[in-house]
Amino acid sequence: MEYLKSIGYKDDFLSYLKDLKFTGSIRSMQEGELCFGNEPLLRVEAPLIQAQLIETILLNIVNFHTLITTKASRIRQIASNDKLMEFGTRRAQEIDAALWGARAAYIGGFDSTSNVRAGKLFGIPVSGTHAHAFVQTYGDEYVAFKKYAERHKNCVFLVDTFHTLKSGVPNAIKVAKELGDKINFVGIRLDSGDIAYLSKEARRMLDEAGFTETKIIASNDLDEETITSLKAQGAKVDSWGVGTKLITGYDQPALGAVYKLVAIENEDGSYSDRIKLSNNAEKVTTPGKKNVYRIINKKTGKAEGDYITLENENPYDEQPLKLFHPVYTYKMKFIKSFEAIDLHHNIYENGKLVYQIPTEDESRDYLAQGLQSIWDENKRFLNPQEYPVDLSKACWDNKHKRIFEVAEHVKEMEEDNE
């Protein structure tokens, strides 16, 4: 408060802020819910100043977590049943991003993290390997691996410090044979070079030495695209350590979720809808208090699309349900047998938390289950079929009504200024 006062805020406003408590209500999608462009992830109903004060923190949380969870989910879909380890702490923008990014990656489908604090805070399994510096300290891979094995029952040896195939893998095998049942030779890690070639050669060497169950872990600037390529080349990799390109959202470093006013309460308790127009069609908001439903075809068990309605609408009132593209309205389909799942849950009611916050494991499982309801054609990475996000007829009509109202208002202003 002293700082705010020092930059010019008045005492009466500071006194108001000091006693301010959130009294509004929030409806939101569940963590781990699949979401798509142009649909409301959450809805805030509160006095205007309260709604504005929470804007920045809401966008900060939603944008970052959604970005990293989405990237992690994409990698999980490509990796299939392979183990995925989050290795991004060193490359994260800062320590909080590393911690929360590890959590987001776990919810997105990763199996573990190398960030021990994230493991402690969020109950995420922890995994990792020793560093190149450990091998360099001893100057000899055989000595380093043996020293490591003396202290660790479960051993994963990093084999690319000097020469992967001439030194690293042979010395890992040598130590494992010498120590036998005293250790579990869990795996080796490849962190540089031609991963496809090296993994195939390393697999051959391990198998010939009798270590057919020893796993090969790969890292080094991986993401869904490089993993896809390596799999296509027949790489013999069992687990993937993904860091930089996950934790930074490398190919899309920022998510563009926005927070917009869509209605305001009048003195008599009624609501007036609000719209923001733009020369960019995708930035035109959809006015009014809205709900979002996922329309599941009962025959296929798959999602036909998401259906945005005004608050007082019930999708079941329209039989069959008509879905049409909000821009190319001639694109339409009719769904006769469907389930409409309300994607918004009551989180806060009149300032009180009324929602049971799920655990990280529950959110992770929920996301994985949700993916099963989406057609493969919508999930493919190359030229995916657009997932429908449609407006109800009433919602579509209301939007265009508001557009024309604003256009008339602008026209009147132009005439007044002439």
Where are the model-predicted features located?
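Low-complexity, highly charged intrinsically disordered N-terminal segments
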Residues: 1-5
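Gly/Ser/Thr/Ala-enriched C-terminal appendages of enzymes
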Residues: 222-418
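Buried, small/hydrophobic-residue-enriched core segments of structured protein domains
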Residues: 8, 14-23, 32-212, 222-232, ...
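Short hydrophobic alpha-helical runs that function as membrane-insertion/retention elements
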Residues: 128, 217, 238-241
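Short, positively charged
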Residues: 6-14, 94, 319-327
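Short acidic, Pro/Gly- and aromatic-enriched capping/linker segments at domain boundaries
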Residues: 26-32, 338-343
